[in-house]
Structure formats: C-alpha cells, structure tokens
Amino acid sequence: MNENIDKDFSSHTPMMQQYLKLKAQHPEILLFYRMGDFYELFYDDAKRASQLLDISLTKRGASAGEPIPMAGIPYHAVENYLAKLVNQGESVAICEQIGDPATSKGPVERKVVRIVTPGTISDEALLQERQDNLLAAIWQDSKGFGYATLDISSGRFRLSEPADRETMAAELQRTNPAELLYAEDFAEMSLIEGRRGLRRRPLWEFEIDTARQQLNLQFGTRDLVGFGVENAPRGLCAAGCLLQYAKDTQRTTLPHIRSITMEREQDSIIMDAATRRNLEITQNLAGGAENTLASVLDCTVTPMGSRMLKRWLHMPVRDTRVLLERQQTIGALQDFTAELQPVLRQVGDLERILARLALRTARPRDLARMRHAFQQLPELRAQLETVDSAPVQALREKMGEFAELRDLLERAIIDTPPVLVRDGGVIASGYNEELDEWRALADGATDYLERLEVRERERTGLDTLKVGFNAVHGYYIQISRGQSHLAPINYMRRQTLKNAERYIIPELKEYEDKVLTSKGKALALEKQLYEELFDLLLPHLEALQQSASALAELDVLVNLAERAYTLNYTCPTFIDKPGIRITEGRHPVVEQVLNEPFIANPLNLSPQRRMLIITGPNMGGKSTYMRQTALIALMAYIGSYVPAQKVEIGPIDRIFTRVGAADDLASGRSTFMVEMTETANILHNATEYSLVLMDEIGRGTSTYDGLSLAWACAENLANKIKALTLFATHYFELTQLPEKMEGVANVHLDALEHGDTIAFMHSVQDGAASKSYGLAVAALAGVPKEVIKRARQKLRELESISPNAAATQVDGTQMSLLSVPEEISPAVEALENLDPDSLTPRQALEWIYRLKSLV
C-alpha cells in the first residue's frame, strides 16, 4: 500500500474507506475485493497483480484527490487466477459481499471469508493431483529443531524434532513444503533461504502453553499423552503456530484434523538431502519427474494412492512386521490386479473431497464423485472377500460400505450436477416436496409463454408477435417495427429496438413476479438443502477418512503387486545380521529406459565382507551398480518386491550417498568443499547398520591429497565404523586395501578396447580393474583426434620415465586415464580373458551376441 494513503481514511469515499480498513487487516497479502461480477484490486495490490497475472492496470476515479490504480478479474474465472498466484508463492485474501445491496445504506457490507495461501489450499483447481501439498512450521532452540507439517487437503498432521542441521535439511528436502512458517528470531536462516512460501511469524505464536491449549482444543482432549507427543516441546511449538495459522486462513473449524503423529528417526531409514537427490526417488537431478524411481513404480490408479506411495518411498520403514505384512499382501493380490484396478480407478480422490467436505467448501461435483466412490465399494468388497490374506481383510473392513450415505446422495444430487450450487439445478427432483413445487411454478413458464404467444397472435392478427425474456427487462411481447402501430391499446411499451418494439401487459407482469419469486425461493431452498447435506455427512467424517486411507493403501499395494508381476520382481528376504546379498540385481529405472537387455549383477556384503572397492572405466557402470544397490534396499524397506533374482537384506538404519558433485556457488562452496562436507556427514553419522555409497572421493583436489583422503575415509569406514560400503575409485592404490585389512574386497566392471573404440561389458567381476580406458572414452566423447594423438605421445613419454607404468599407474598414484592402443581384435581379446567354465548358459548366449557385435 502506498505510504501516502491517509491513515484515518476520512478523506476517501465511503467505499474506499471500507476497502482500506479491510486492507489494513491484511497488509502483506493481495486483497480480492468483490464488486458485483468482479474481484477488484487497488493501489499497490493492483500494480503487483497486473505484473503477476499479466492483466491490465487501469484507474478508478479518484479518492482523496488521487486517481486510484485498479485491476480486476471476473469472479467466475477466479480459480485460474488464484492458481497462478499460488504457484508464484503469493497469498490472497478473498473479500465477499455479505450484505444485500437492495437493503444497504452506503457500501454493501463485505468481509474476508477466506485466505488462500500456497500451504492451505484445498480447491481441486489449485492443487497438484498426485503430490502432497504441505504447510510446515519450523522452530529452533538451544537443544535442536521442532518441525511440524500439515496437509490441509487430507488432515494429515505430523511433527518431529530433528536433532541437528543436517537432519533438519533432510526433513525439508523430504517434505518439500509449499509454505514454511518460521519465527522472527530464527537463527539458521541459511537453512531455509530461497525456499518458496516463506512466512515470518511473531514469537508468541510459537509459545508452548498456547500450543498445548490449541491442540487439546482441536482434538477435544485434556492432554496430548495419547498422541505420543507430550514430551516433544520443540515439535509442539511448531505445531501450535501451524494450527493457528491454518485456522486464521480458513476462517472455519477444521474437523478433519483429528490427531497428530510423532515421526521418530528410529522408525524409518534416514536419508540425508544429498542421498534423496542422488537416488532420484521422486525428482531427477534436472528437477523433473522423468526417469525417477517413482516414475517406474507409480502406476497407481487414484491420486491419493499416488501420494501415499511417494510418502512411502521417502520414508522407508524399519519395522519388519509392517514390511512382511506388505509383502504378504502384495503376494496375495498378484492374481487380482486386473479386476481390482479398474474399480479402484473409479474411486477417485476421496481423501481430498472429504477435506473440502470438512471445510464446507465441497462443490456439487465433489458430492457426485463421493457418491460414485461409494457405488464402487460393494464390488470392491466382493472382489476382496476371496483374497486369502488377513491384512487384505483388515483393509476391506476399514473400507466400510456407507450404503446409507450412498442412498442419501443418490436421492439428493442429480446425476451430473453443475459446478456451483449458486447456479441451482443441483438437488434432484423428488428429494424435497417444497422445492419441487417452487420449481414447477418456475418451470411452468415455458408452457405459459407458448400459450400466451398463440393466444395474442390470434387475438391481434399480428404474425410478427412473439413472447420472450431477458435478464435486464424481464418478460416482454415483441412486435416488428412495421406492425408496431397496430399494437392493442393495453400494450405498454417497455423497450424500443432498431427493428422492433417490446411491450408488457398486466397479465404478463403479474406472471413475471410470480415466476421470479418462485425461482428465487427455489434457489434459496436449494442452497439450504445443500448445506443440510453437509450436516448429514459430517458426523461420518472419521469413518470416511479411515475408508479413504484404506482405499489409498489398497491402491498402493495392488499397484506394487502389478509392478512386481509386470517387471519380473522378486520378494526380498529380511535377515537379522547386517548384510545385503543380491543375485542378478538390476537397476529399476535404467532397465526400463535401455533399448537392450540390462546386464544383471550380483552383490555380496556381510560382516565379513563389509566394503567393496569398485574399479573400472568411466561409463563402465560403477555408479549404476552402486545406485541400484541403494534402490533395491529402499524398495525392500517400503515392502515392495525388487528387481533381482534373489535378495537377502539385513537391518539398515541409514543410506548415505557421496556420488558426483557440483559447485554450490550460491553458498560459496566449491565442488571439493561440497564433497568433503557430505563425506564428513557420513563419517560422523554412519553406523555398522548403514549402507554407504562413496564415488570418486578426493578427485576434486591434487592427486596426493585426494588419494590420502580416499584411503583414510575407506580405512575409517571399514575398520572403525564397519558400515556396508560400496567405494568406487580411480585411485588404483586403493585396490591394495583388501591385503591390508579384513572385510574389504575388490570388484571391477570390465570393458574391451580396440584402437579408439571401446565396448563396455557392464558385468561385475571379482578383483581389481587392469586399466581405466580413459583414452577410448575420450575418443567416444568426441575429443579431437589431434588431442588423442598428442595424449598417446605423452603417455609414451611417461611410460619411458616409469618402466612399469603399463602394469602400475602414472606416477604410481592414479589409474591411467590414457592407454596405449593395442592392435588386437577386441573379439580376440575378449576370448583371451574369458573363462568358459564359469559361464551359465544364459551368460554364454549373451557373450555370443557381444562377440558378434565386436567383429
């Protein structure tokens, strides 16, 4: 708002005084001020809106002697404009006319009826269908952080108490809130800077006693012991602020928020922000959703199922009872997916419809969709009855039937209702006798008008006479200009057109009053009956929410059963001791995008074999092999089947990845600094139950520094921490580690080279790689031939300095990036290195195809 606007408002017109008083209550956000068929914005709001929405900036008269900048949007298109603003992180106060213009003296009474913010939206048009939309609050004191999240579109309310900065950063990455509330004295601003939807809140909103009082009031409880959050003061501070903000913005009760859950670190596998990013769980490194784990696993048929699956993927559980139950359910459902999925698809997004019901913002089509969901329940229950699985039967019971509510909605709502109740025509005929009577009066107009037109034509003999209606002038009798001089004396002129005259007669005027009254009465009664439907449905809200949750879970499990069958996944076995044994493991995403068969590989990690030093050429598949191990572990710990022939997996508490790096220029951190920060986090927090992926540690600095750091890190992980570690490196010295300490083994990925060409085998073999094939990879990448030629010359010089260079490495510190070309056929070389006795029939067949391609 302009600073020069008069603060006492007295110099402004009455309408602008009303606007300015309302705007003063919401200074930080845009105010949509309803005027007739438009929402208007004034002053700085108008200037901002015109830029954000690309709409015209005009002026509206003057107030206090100054022209008023103005922008406006039609009320019927408001959802589209709100969606644009919310996507840009803006919040909007919606101000409606609540008084009657006919009876108002001065400006019509108006008030703000709701505030739309990025984290508190529930409207279907504003939400991403298959993603959670979270409001979050963060609090910090000397003991750590408090963090709370609320999905207002489902009522899911969670809190946690991250102990340190890294854990807090991981939580922010996992939950990715649309809006984040923070205290005005929040110390760790660098943690949240740059995030969307940041909202600074006063300190008193985070007060612990107020928080307890707010939460008890919301849940109708005397204390919070039953929710297991009583001893989480930091989390409660965040939750209290969050709940108050939700109430302030919605301007109504929130009956669908009926509990709060504590999320504890020990309940799930912890993944830091870097790990979530590197594993590309729901978002790829470019920020998109293609070629992610979710893109392969998510063939759910309901939006609420899709959102639940993504929550599972970001919070793998450690409770093997839960996991075994999910595995059993997936196994039991495999023969039923084709029958269940088409019916589940018809259920739709019941979860979000129920939230809108609770907020009393559900539209007629929401109730029609709810009715359609209820109509699927009998068939779903009948199909599930034959499934021999206790967890499936438990879900079937939770689903309920709701025959009474289905019957109510079938009687009350027409088959295909309009978008808004204000347009009428929502309540079905036969539901309410009085409504039917008023409608009959209003609908009888057509017959009456046709009869009147025939009668008057016959009486007057005027063939151009017709009876009509428009919204401005009401009912009329129209006669062409050529015959208007013959109009009877009792015809009173109502409107003159270019080619016709319009008249009214007392009988038509009387009927008009009657029809318009009956239409108004019918519409008012219809709105009342619609509100009463909410009162009839809301007592069942808790059972309905349980049903939606059960249907979403069923969708996820049926989806995982279908994926397991279609993609040839196997059920993993959980074992008590740390370790991972994989037979013919595959990368779930890479195998889907390859145009050729994926080369499956084994893996064996155990207390006796805790670390694998992985060597081999760039592009040879080291990173794929490492990531597929982490993804198989993650999939196993959501209860899913996995891409392998056989998997045995022990307890895992954390998954760490130090894979690739880019400069974090915004924070002033180089590639090497980023790498070392992530490495420090691993060395401080990994345990013997952690799975650690380390790729090319130390390459961001000088050779000797890098090698020393890589050696020390590997030694620490293997000897002290004893974590299950995959350690990929180009430092050939590290392949000596197995000789110097127990529990370490070498594996390598092979390649065949001929001149400037190279064939990657992508198969993991025991032992260290003999060379790095850097020259061939460089040629493959399109490095100019003269550069490759000069590199060969330089390599010969280096070899002459170090006679054993070919057998060892340049300067004895780093695997050779360049290799002397050998004029041996790659097929011959392949055969020389081949041990035929070690091949399975399938591998032998694969080798024949490879050799054929090398000739």
Curated annotation (Swiss-Prot):
Entry protein name: DNA mismatch repair protein MutS
State what this protein does. This protein is involved in the repair of mismatches in DNA. It is possible that it carries out the mismatch recognition step. This protein has a weak ATPase activity.
Q: GO biological process annotations for this chain's record?
A: mismatch repair
The cross-references to InterPro entries, in alphabetical order and at most eight, read:
DNA_mismatch_repair_MutS, DNA_mismatch_repair_MutS-lik_N, DNA_mismatch_repair_MutS/MSH, DNA_mismatch_repair_MutS_C, DNA_mismatch_repair_MutS_clamp, DNA_mismatch_repair_MutS_core, DNA_mismatch_repair_MutS_N, DNA_mismatch_repair_MutS_sf
Name the PANTHER family for this protein: DNA MISMATCH REPAIR PROTEIN MSH1, MITOCHONDRIAL, DNA MISMATCH REPAIR PROTEIN MUTS FAMILY MEMBER
What is the originating organism of this protein?
A: Escherichia coli O139:H28 (strain E24377A / ETEC)
Q: Name one GO molecular function term.
A: ATP binding
In this UniProt entry, which cysteines form S-S bonds? Answer: none
For this UniProt record, give its keywords in alphabetical order, as a comma-separated list: ATP-binding, DNA damage, DNA repair, DNA-binding, Nucleotide-binding
Tell me what gene encodes this. mutS
Instruction: Please list the residues that bind ATP.
Output: G616, P617, N618, M619, G620, G621, K622, S623
Family membership, please give it: Belongs to the DNA mismatch repair MutS family.
Highest taxon listed in the record's lineage? Bacteria
Q: Which GO terms describe its cellular component?
A: cytosol
NCBIfam families reported in the protein's UniProt record? mutS1, PRK05399.1
